[in-house]
Regions:
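Residue-level detector of functional hotspots within protein domains
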Residues: 51, 58, 63, 68, ...
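Active-site flanking residues adjacent to catalytic metal/cofactor-binding acidic residues
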Residues: 159, 250-252
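Rhodanese-like catalytic fold shared by cysteine-dependent sulfurtransferases
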Residues: 199-247, 255-290, 295-337
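Short glycine-rich, polar/acidic loop-and-turn segments at beta strand-coil junctions
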Residues: 78, 83, 253-254, 295
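Feature for soluble, non-membrane regions of globular proteins
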Residues: 1-210
């Protein structure tokens, strides 16, 4: 199977002490490269003649596949357990008291484990062992040394690429910032699922879909998903562009945001979302329109929805421009447009 890029699950501009620049670089460059590498490894394996291939070649590719799979999964878990305010839930506090003696004892061990990787590399995981029915803090080296029959519920990336942009060699400050941004609701949900005690969220199921006009930077991906807006993934968009002479791809980043950046998707045109009444008349109603913003949270969704109301076959890009770059999509200098 081909591994696909997930949209960045956090609002990278809203973290406490972890910069948007660092988080986006981590997502686009490190996570994105790993996804593409995994797909390349699998292509090599698919083309390999196993009847004649040397054992060392098979062994090397399978090891590389294992490490790449681990890196992809751990990166996705890492990003997804950020975005909170660091306030621990009562359920997780009770779990730490049961398994470590107290929240403070767990915190001391977890942070000491993280500090032990200063100047090195690896992951720090809080994992639930189904075999032991117990929580453990552990180190995972080379993206693959995880406990057997265990589920990571909290993931901290201690590779230098995760923090050097903001913190240089000061890994301790990075660890402190990470702890301030943990989404303990996410961690608790993972633990409940690992233990088999997760209950279906009736509140989430019953939550009414909000109006598109209410979309703002405060929305998370689950709230946007409940709107059921027409969308497209980076892989699907790449296929659409490849089969058309000229695809209608719009960069809908707001003017104040667009002016701060020097690049954009190759082949796209920028249009100010505040002036949709003017430029929407230039679009061809017989061709689909693909709209992206920076991260796929609200601007691109709103513009695509407004175009649909005007009779266009419009879709927003899930994950926005950042997911396109993570997938290795072509870019160009915005001043050329």
């Amino acid at each position: 199977m081909r591994q696909t890029i997930i949209p960045i699950p956090i609002r990278p501009w809203a973290l406490n002490g972890l910069s948007e620049r660092m988080m986006v670089s981590h997502y686009e460059n490190d996570y994105g490269t790993t996804v593409r590498t995994l797909n390349e490894i699998r292509e090599e394996l698919a083309e390999l003649d196993l009847a004649t291939a040397r054992g060392y070649r098979v062994r090397s590719l399978k090891r590389e596949e294992h490490a790449a799979m681990g890196s992809v999964a751990l990166h996705e878990l890492y990003f997804s357990n950020l975005g909170g305010d660091g306030r621990m839930t009562s359920a997780m506090a009770a779990a730490f008291t049961e398994h470590f003696g107290s929240v403070e004892l767990w915190r001391k061990e977890f942070m000491a484990t993280a500090r032990s990787l200063r100047g090195g590399s690896g992951w720090v995981l809080l994992s639930y062992s189904r075999r032991d029915r117990w929580l453990y803090n552990q180190i995972a080296l080379d993206h693959s040394n995880v406990l057997v029959d265990a589920t990571p519920v909290l993931v901290l990336d201690m590779y230098e690429h995760a923090y050097h942009i903001d913190f240089g060699a000061n890994a301790v400050a990075y660890i402190d910032a990470f702890m301030r941004n943990i989404d303990w609701e996410v961690v608790g949900a993972r633990l409940a699922e690992a233990k088999g005690t997760a209950a279906r969220s009736q509140e989430a199921d019953a939550a009414p879909a909000r109006s598109v006009k209410e979309l703002s930077s405060e929305f998370d991906l689950s709230a946007i998903d409940r709107l059921n807006l027409p969308s497209i993934t980076v892989e699907e968009l790449s296929a659409e562009i490849a089969k058309r002479d000229h695809a209608q791809v719009l960069d809908a980043r707001p003017a104040h945001y667009f002016s701060r950046y020097h690049d954009m998707m190759k082949g796209a045109i920028w249009r100010d979302p505040a002036l949709i009444d003017e430029w929407s008349k230039e679009l061809s109603p017989s061709e689909p329109v693909f709209v992206y913003c920076a991260y796929g949270f609200h601007v691109g969704c709103r513009v695509a929805a407004e175009l649909c109301e005007r009779g266009f076959d419009a879709k927003y890009l899930r994950g926005g421009l950042s997911s396109w770059y993570a997938a290795g999509g072509a870019r160009t200098l915005s001043r050329e447009k």
